[in-house]
Amino acid sequence: MKKIEAIAFDMYGTLYDVHSVVDACEKQYPGKGKDISVLWRQKQLEYAWLRCLMGQYIKFEEATANALTYTCNQMKLDCDEGSAMRLTEEYLRLKPFPEVRGALRALRQRGMRLAILSNGSTETIHDVVHNSGVEGEFEHLISVDSARAYKPHPLAYELGEEAFGISRESILFVSSNPWDVSGAKAFGYQVCWINRYGFAFDELGQTPDFTVPVMDAIVHLIAV
């Protein structure tokens, strides 16, 4: 196993809690916030992947908006244009998990090169990172838009290798999403799965090199 020279992080669900939109959903639709958030996220990913398979790539934000429309229709909720816009804008204000800021700072202090490699658009990645005050921690903010393919497609992971300018075997890819970890491992990255909730790992023919419960543990991995 090669020495780790750089780390690429997934954004949604790894650095940032996608279910931090629950409060906004609950305010809009009392008693239904959590259910909306769960179905919305499920359809967001599903629509992105299906569009990719269909050869009809759209930006992740459009897939997010479409997923919200489906969710409201499925749950028989009235959702006018203004309400939909307010909820989708919550994805620009996602909250980082509690340990993220400290872990990023510690990794940078150890001289580690850091990047985000996300299915989100360039504009959204910049907005989310800026709004959470951690933009100075990253060397690269990488969107899959230039590849026009969503993770876990190999073309998406290739962007991280190109940005860092080093071999994929020297890059650690970190995600809390098993499908993302599997895609990155198949591409050739070293991979770390953040398993915050004690889930079983997906049976996709890949195994993470490291599994940690929270992001702080990555700092100790690098220090070894």
Swiss-Prot record:
Recorded hits in InterPro entries, A to Z, give: 2-HAD (IPR006328), HAD-like_sf (IPR036412), HAD-SF_hydro_IA (IPR006439), HAD_sf (IPR023214), PGP-like_dom2 (IPR023198), S-2-haloacid_dehalogenase (IPR051540)
Family of this protein: Belongs to the HAD-like hydrolase superfamily. S-2-haloalkanoic acid dehalogenase family.
Misc. comment: Two haloacetate dehalogenase enzymes exist in Moraxella strain B. DehH1 acts predominantly on fluoroacetate, dehH2 acts on chloro-, bromo- and iodoacetate, but not on fluoroacetate.
Q: What protein name is recorded for this chain? A: Haloacetate dehalogenase H-2
Reaction(s) the record says it catalyses: a haloacetate + H2O = a halide anion + glycolate + H(+)
Q: Which UniProt keywords apply?
A: Hydrolase, Plasmid
Q: Which residues participate directly in catalysis? A: D10 (nucleophile)
Asked whether the UniProt record includes Hydrolase among its keywords, one would answer yes
Might you give the EC number(s) for this enzyme? 3.8.1.3
GO molecular function annotations of the record: haloacetate dehalogenase activity
